[in-house]
Regions:
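Zn-dependent metallo-beta-lactamase
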Residues: 1-44, 191, 209, 217
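Active-site environment of divalent metal-dependent phosphoester hydrolases
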Residues: 31, 63-68, 89-92, 107-110, ...
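Active-site neighborhood of phospho(di)ester-bond hydrolases with catalytic His/Asp-centered motifs
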Residues: 24-25, 55-68, 83-86, 141-146, ...
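A short acidic, amphipathic alpha-helical/loop segment
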Residues: 71-75, 91, 95-96, 151, ...
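Pre-active-site segment of Zn-dependent metallo-hydrolases
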Residues: 20-59, 70-72, 148-154
């Protein structure tokens, strides 16, 4: 039995639980901007990635474009089952995906032997999702902004996917809290493996906010 994780940059991952292939928060091609517009913050991928083949599940933590990226989701077959937060479910529904399970924090569903429990994630502004994933091949927790659900009990896990740095704006504070959450995750889950997410990959940002984004810490310091 094997549990494998392949990083796709930003928040994207391909998780493999034996032969079950789960794509998480993919950003594979095109630019990235938020509802305020690209003048404020725009991300560009210098190199596009093809969509991985033979997928069994699409798992989305948030409905924002850096998690539910419409141009990337458009690459995927519409009969691919989707599990996501309420806001993510609205995005994939608008794109014509056929089988969508919307989860609120605390709710659980099962897909081909994988138990998916939604946990309370980042308030952006509505509370989005992290996930506790349990399969015979292994157990994994992921949340892309460093917000740990206080209701999750202590339990040993095989892997944790989390940011390892803090990202924020002056006067507003951190909206990604990797430095502070990593020690809590280690204490609560005693993971065999910690995998750094969110701030990695080959991404170029522009716009008014790009020059004042603050990053504190590093993978080496936090790990």
């Amino acid at each position: 039995m094997t549990l494998a994780a392949t990083y796709y940059g930003a928040n994207g991952w391909l998780l493999e639980f034996n032969n079950l292939r789960v794509l998480v928060d993919p950003w594979l091609r095109g630019s990235l901007s938020f509802p305020t517009g690209s003048w404020l913050l725009k991300g560009v991928l210098p190199h596009e990635r093809p969509a991985p083949g033979t997928l069994d599940l699409l798992l989305l933590t948030q409905g924002l474009a850096d998690h539910s990226h419409p141009e990337s989701l458009d690459l995927l077959p519409r009969d691919l089952p989707v599990i996501g937060s309420a806001s993510a479910a609205r995005v994939v529904q608008s794109l014509g995906f056929q089988t969508i399970t919307s989860l609120k924090p605390g709710e659980t569903t099962n897909h081909q032997g994988l138990t998916v429990r939604a946990t309370a994630g980042a308030p952006v502004p509505m509370v989005e999702n992290g996930y506790l994933l349990e399969h015979e091949a292994g157990q994994l927790y992921l949340e892309p902004h460093g917000f740990l659900d206080p209701n999750l009990p202590e339990q040993p896990l095989d892997a944790v996917i989390t940011p390892m740095v803090d990202l924020g704006l002056p006067a507003l504070g951190a909206f990604v809290k990797g430095c502070s959450v990593a020690p809590e995750l280690v204490q609560r889950f005693q993971p065999t493996t910690m995998l750094a997410s969110t701030s990695g990959g080959d991404v170029r940002f522009s716009g008014a906010l790009s020059g004042i984004l603050q990053m504190n810490g590093s993978v080496e310091q936090t790990g």
